[in-house]
């Protein structure tokens, strides 16, 4: 499992240590990368199978990753989180109204890192319009400082990445 290359490139924006929330973590490739760097990671996903794989690899390397099964479509789910030094969302389109709740869980000077599809790729029929990250989705975090925004391509896939600072 290889972590997201742009996360590695962007780690300079993150606090040097602390607690990070990985939303919709899947198998946890980014969680594992961050834990290897010494961060305390809280990883959330709706798939028990994916979290079991993440737990297996984390235990194998004795990494500090807390996993949680959760449905992000449940209205109150995000209200019961810790406070974090950074939150990452990779290849998952969060409902726009949830960003304001999420920002309450980022510590002062903390980071929100969002990476997602900018357009539907021609080589992956599983990605639909519902998966595309839109500027208007982020309207509730406009008052925070946008540290960096980048559009990039890997093969036929185009992505957009945002780094917000609270």
Residue ranges and their predicted role:
Residues 1-15:
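S-adenosyl-L-methionine
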Residues 40-45:
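Conserved SAM-binding motif I beta-strand of class I
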Residues 47-49:
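Conserved SAM/SAH-binding beta-strand->alpha-helix loop
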Residues 61-73:
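Conserved SAM-binding strand-loop segment of SAM-dependent methyltransferases
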Residues 77-86:
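A short acidic, Gly/Pro-enriched loop at the edge of an enzyme's catalytic core
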Residues 85-98:
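A short SAM/SAH-binding and catalytic strip from SAM-dependent methyltransferases
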Residues 99-110:
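A short glycine-rich, Lys/Arg-flanked "PGG" loop and its adjoining helix->strand segment in the class I
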Residues 109-119:
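Conserved beta-strand signature within the Rossmann-like core of class I S-adenosyl-L-methionine
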């Amino acid at each position: 499992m290889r972590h997201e290359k742009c996360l590695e490139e962007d780690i300079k924006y993150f606090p040097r240590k602390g607690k990070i929330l990985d939303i919709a973590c899947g198998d946890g490739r980014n969680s594992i990368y961050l834990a290897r760097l010494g961060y305390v990671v809280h990883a959330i996903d709706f798939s028990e199978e994916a979290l079991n794989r993440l737990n297996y690899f984390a235990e194998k390397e004795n990494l500090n990753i807390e996993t949680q099964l959760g449905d992000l479509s449940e209205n109150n789910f995000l209200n019961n989180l810790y406070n974090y030094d950074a939150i990452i969302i990779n290849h998952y389109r969060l409902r726009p109204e949830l960003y304001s709740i999420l920002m309450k869980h980022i510590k002062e000077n903390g980071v929100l890192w969002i990476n997602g599809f900018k357009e539907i790729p021609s080589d992956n029929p599983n990605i639909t319009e519902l998966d595309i990250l839109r500027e208007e989705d982020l309207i509730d975090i406009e008052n925070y400082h946008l540290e960096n925004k980048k559009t990039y391509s890997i093969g036929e896939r185009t992505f957009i990445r945002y780094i917000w600072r609270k």
